[in-house]
Each structure stands twice: as structure tokens, then as C-alpha cells.
Regions:
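N-terminal hydrophobic or amphipathic helices and topogenic motifs
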Residues: 1-76, 207-208
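Bilobed "Venus flytrap"/periplasmic-binding protein-like clamshell domains
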Residues: 2-23, 83-142, 149
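General small-molecule cofactor/ligand-binding pocket signal
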Residues: 34-38, 123-127, 163
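Structural motif
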Residues: 54, 68-69, 100, 143-145, ...
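Short loop/helix-cap segments at secondary-structure boundaries that form the rim of catalytic
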Residues: 63-66, 114, 153-156
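Active-site regions of enzymes building and remodeling cell-envelope glycoconjugates
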Residues: 68-73, 122-123, 159-162
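Hydrophobic/proline-rich hinge and linker segments of small-molecule sensing/allosteric domains
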Residues: 71-93, 171-188
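Pocket-lining segment of extracytoplasmic ligand-binding domains
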Residues: 128-209
Length: 209
């Protein structure tokens, strides 16, 4: 049995996928698992240093990484669904191009999508994802790029949805799935047999959930 560190986010989909493992309902004789639960940009940055055996990362971040293998299970993608931009007032796309926009990290897929949709003339302000609605409400930024539960749980009496990047991608690609996040294994820290053993464990955890 080897000890491995597994990185994942606290959001609902990761909680669902890892519940079987975390709760002990899905057991492994191969691994003793230490969980590293952080926001996705922290996990993206940790991946560059090979600090984690297994981790969730943004699909965008994976482009810049080496010595990793994508797991067959646990990826997330959107079908006409994805990150959105919120503001306290109605803003056009042209106005957004001249705005200060809070983003949940420059390596996130959401940040890449925003640049694909608007170009690069807007000013990015990196902000922890859970603090972005508050930054918009307090006037620290003109708009905020939100991910995870904030996409559906935002207060519609306070915020306008001024750009839907899931819808934008759906139109631009004629309905292709939008790759958002993936799970990867460090080939520096694990051999192929260990990676395959974890994939089986992770699949069983998802099936249990």
C-alpha cells in the first residue's frame, strides 16, 4: 500500500465523485489517501510542481503541463452550459471589453473562454472564486466571471447575467461539449499500474455516489 495525495475542489460535483472514497464506503487495498481540498486555481498551480499524485485541473491548465496522464473518469464538460459573467448593471460585450472583470484564476478554463469571447482588452483581477460575487456587489470590479454553484445560485435581484459563456461556446461550435475540468495523474509520482488502480477506485466511487 502506498500513500498518495489527491487534490480536488470543495464544489458539489467533486464532493459527489469523491464521497465513496472519503466516506470509506469504497475501500482500497492499494492506497492510503490524503485529500488536498482547494479551489481549482490552487490545484492548477500545484500541478506545475507535481505536489499531488492525482489532482483535478482546468482543461486550460493541462495545455501547459507535462508528465501527466488524463484519467478516464471524473472529467466535467458543459452542454450549452458554462461560466457566466455577472454585473450590477446591464453591460454589452463592447462595454465588458473596457471593464475590470474578476476572474477565478488565469489558468482556469473560464478565463480562457472569456478571452476567446471578448479578446484581451479588459482588465483581469484574479479573485478567489467564492469571493467574486461579493467583489462585484461591493463595486471593487465592474463584473465577475463566476463558476461552480455561483452560476446558478446568484441573487437575481442584485446581479445581471451579462454574458453566458456556455451559450456562447455552444453557438460558436455548433453544439460541441465544452471541456471544463479533468482529473490527472502525475507520471513522475506514479507508475502505470498505480494509475490504473486509482482509475478503478475512482470509477467505483463515482458509481457509488
Amino acid at each position: 500500500m502506498i500513500e498518495i495525495t489527491v487534490g480536488h475542489t470543495p464544489d458539489a460535483d467533486d464532493a459527489f465523485m469523491f464521497y465513496g472514497i472519503v466516506s470509506g464506503k469504497v475501500k482500497s487495498s492499494d492506497f492510503k489517501i490524503k485529500h488536498f481540498v482547494e479551489d481549482i486555481e490552487t490545484l492548477n498551480k500545484a500541478a506545475f510542481k507535481h505536489q499531488l499524485h492525482i489532482t483535478a485541473v482546468s482543461a486550460h491548465a493541462y495545455y501547459y503541463l507535462s508528465d501527466y496522464q488524463i484519467l478516464h473518469t471524473g472529467g466535467s464538460f458543459g452542454l450549452n452550459y458554462g461560466p457566466i459573467v455577472l454585473s450590477k448593471k446591464k453591460l454589452t460585450q463592447n462595454q465588458l471589453r473596457d471593464s475590470i472583470i474578476a476572474v477565478p484564476g488565469k489558468l482556469t478554463t473560464a478565463s480562457l473562454l472569456l478571452k476567446l469571447a471578448l479578446g484581451t482588452s479588459f482588465t483581469e483581477k484574479e479573485t478567489q472564486f467564492e469571493l467574486i460575487p461579493e467583489a462585484v456587489q461591493n463595486g471593487q470590479v465592474d463584473a465577475g466571471l463566476v463558476i461552480h454553484e455561483a452560476q446558478i445560485a446568484y441573487d437575481k435581484s442584485v446581479f445581471y447575467k451579462v454574458l453566458d459563456l456556455g451559450s456562447w461556446w455552444n453557438t460558436e461550435t455548433s453544439g460541441l461539449p465544452l471541456p471544463l475540468g479533468i482529473n490527472i495523474a502525475s507520471t513522475k509520482l506514479m507508475n502505470e499500474a498505480q494509475i490504473q488502480a486509482f482509475q478503478t477506485l475512482f470509477k467505483n466511487s463515482i458509481l457509488y455516489g
